[in-house]
């Protein structure tokens, strides 16, 4: 018997060794194709993204602006056709008004061919949309939400010569959510097909558009100019881009010489328009406003979440956009509004960080109100200004008679106003004014001259410092709320950690004067000088680097021009400089003849610094020849982060996934109907998210759980119909493709943000791999004793009174590695209990490897990346994504245990089980984590109140504060308590009980003056009542920063009747029973006599009736006989009567 492999053919031929030449040929073809794609990748392919309206989907060249902010009802008819699908036809499916049209391009290649090639190879663009929460956390709860979608391919609806040659694009819905106007769109591939690097777009809502009578979109703030002239930029220098960081949906940029025009962009200058503003530009100069000339130039322009501010001469205007996802439509402006009409405003100062649910703008005055400042507050689109100080001037508190406030910055969370004040002698002061307590303090007297700091990187300004003859010329202030770093800048840079002691950064030359400063709020800063130089430095360090112009910039710029880059030119002008997601971007106008254009380009600081790095080397003898040995500028070879919390868990981001429905089309192309279904499903998914606020804990606290709860058992049947082309409309809806994600793949790297609740902590492990010579000394091959110093890491906490940090270092000599375990713990000191998003303490942690900043550059496909330095924001307070829920399942189980029984209502309701009045009621609660999917028992303290109630669900009413006190307080003396407990702990004012999971429970009372007293049954079932309960841990719980507030309804049945009504019922029942007994007794006694009397009466009646009948008969017979004799002859013999009569006679 011959044994063969399981898959060998059944034949008498022995198995032979396979010929592998064909395999190697195929492998070579595959490698060549991969090589060709690698070459394409080196050509820097990039994603393309435009916004399409719902009705324009499929039009290849269509492009729209994000003007409509309400869902539309356009998909209902399509969903009605989807029979035999898991959707509920009774639901009202809406859609979003826009699609995202996606494609990609590579230099020198046809876009249409690239798209077709990518689709046939299986490439699918993945789209992740991240929503930024609103500034006003009082109106909109802070939450971080993202949704991951897969783009669906669709052929263009335009003319094409052949089906295979049609223009191909990918589409996804463009969803939006209430409370958000800023959304970033990340696009990347599914890993199949051509390589296109991940790219981020900003698709923000535009609330500054209107429609004319014909329905055409127009700008409400001005008139769009179709031509961007080079003269606009020849005469204008670069200017700062001012906006509320992370929350401004549009950017505006003024500064065009003698023109009331601004650059406007709702995509972070991915595209833009030039607008001529529709403002009056009237001149109101007077004796109190010392401005010498008039100019139409827009000098200052600031963008906030909803409102734009501009300054022209001394006039200030604002325009509030129409954002119905943030506030009522009536808050929007119809025209520019002029504010502070009687003031002469010399400057607007931005406030980059919001606070207290509002945004702020500062207006500096001159003239009659010199020494005062106007604080503008923007809340829900409503603008108000307040002049401070009230009743006295800042100048009154400083030496000299007059002063001038040259710059101001506002720390909203502290309510501190930092002022750069110049007195009449020319001396500058740093002044702090507290807007809450109305106090003013002089923090620092700025030196008059530049310090002498030869051959030093920095200099601490003490009394022993010597100074040069160059005057200090302060120009402005900058404060970073995340690390408490304050900068004073001009022809110098001063930095301070405590606003009282300053460090002079000596690398910045005193010959240059800073024009403006920009910050990434991720540890990086850049400044632009009057000569358009760009300098760069890392916060917490002391080295300042000139990046433009520099040797590195010349090298990089020339290489780009050699590659014929469309972003570089021989003749160009810097328009502005700003950070976006930690990367530094330039807005540059290129003066190429016939191709003048404005471009947004990345300034690769890492690459420029790498080009600028020195190349130290030594010549060493190796035998008979000499060799060059380069010295490492970076102290480590590699750096790795391990044991890092997941990004979306640390940043408290709720993630959803929505994939397009499968279609039966042979090439996998979608059409308008299938995309409409995709729209409806995405809308319903986010609608479930927004409406998920169930007070009763579900078995699975996922918004999508109930969506498919009763349909999952039929999923095989639905797939069977689709696979056999029997599904309606040729669509298959995969229920697993619309769900919440708790563990995302590829979620690696250090998080961009950490949220810490009370006493919480997180750990990060940093592994530093050294070069071969790090662990050896110059004269010995053995390990040195200074390894920990060569590979040292520093951890700096911005607020050490709030956080504690420990670093544990392990040296692995055999691995040439140093492991640093970092643990950060909240000290429970710096935040107060509050709702989600409120009372947040914003701080940060900085990681820095000794000698790494500026010396360690990692080369990547996207350019050089600075290594060895990282700033991580930390928010201390109640983290988003946590909620309190009533654990009804465990409450019922525990009730059955302590009461030895559990009786539900006769008519059961699975959503709201009943509890018996006479049973002890001990509620339990869950803390549900909507980000991680975890849930656990709430072990803190809380206050329980009955705040409403009714006999039915429809008649529940809310009680007044007085009623709540009477119904719940142990101090009540009106006999109105609804419940009581044996708990002895109460609030400080003794008004309410403080309970916990260990409390003995609630005993229902329903006393005489309570609303549940003496409930009359409406049927044969016992009385019942619905209580509206409020549970809050505010002020009584020390286990969390979260102010949990839960309102839920408890259904109680078996309520007793009042004593009066009970007595009345007993009396009535007893009386009725006694009467019935007496009646029965009387009946039993009298009945025989009644029967006898009745019988006697019947006998007599019968006799009487019989007698009367007899006499009547007899008399009638006698009369008849006499009458017969008178008419007839004598009777015949033989008659008995005759014989009797004869005898008688």
UniProtKB/Swiss-Prot annotation:
Additional free-text comment from the UniProt record: Catsperg2 is absent in sperm from mice lacking Catsper1, suggesting that stable expression requires Catsper1.
All ranges on the Cytoplasmic side of the membrane: 1084-1145
Gene label: Catsperg2
Extracellular-facing ranges: 39-1061
Membrane topology annotation: Single-pass type I membrane protein
Location(s) in or outside the cell: Cell projection, Cilium, Flagellum membrane
Source species, domain of life: Eukaryota
An annotated GO BP: cell differentiation
Chain's role: Auxiliary component of the CatSper complex, a complex involved in sperm cell hyperactivation. Sperm cell hyperactivation is needed for sperm motility which is essential late in the preparation of sperm for fertilization.
Protein name in UniProt: Cation channel sperm-associated auxiliary subunit gamma 2
TM region(s), chain numbering: 1062-1083
